[in-house]
Amino acid sequence: MTTNISREPTIQATTFLELIYSDICGPIAPQTRGGNRYIATFIDSATKWAEISLLKTKNEVFSEFKVFLKREQTQSGKTLKRLYSDHGTEYKDSEFEDYLKKRGIIHTYSAPYTHQ
């Protein structure tokens, strides 16, 4: 017996900043003129609004996430409820996790070896 597996995310949102998907692509070659080798993505589940940030290292995702979050919350008047990412060590950093917990943001991880 075979079963079709849905490629649709299991978690869906209905309002802006209810759920943000984040992932890192790279390393890209050649690197940018500024020395960036990675791309961080931030995608809103409800609106499909997407933003990217260029990174020199994967560890820069936390600082870029903070910039993204502050800007989007200020502009929309809404607060982020949930962040969905893979199990990359850059997302499991204790400083990143503490930041999310202090703001009441739930961090959900994808199953290993699955596409965001």
Regions found by a protein language model. Name each.
Residues 1-116:
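Anionic group-binding determinants
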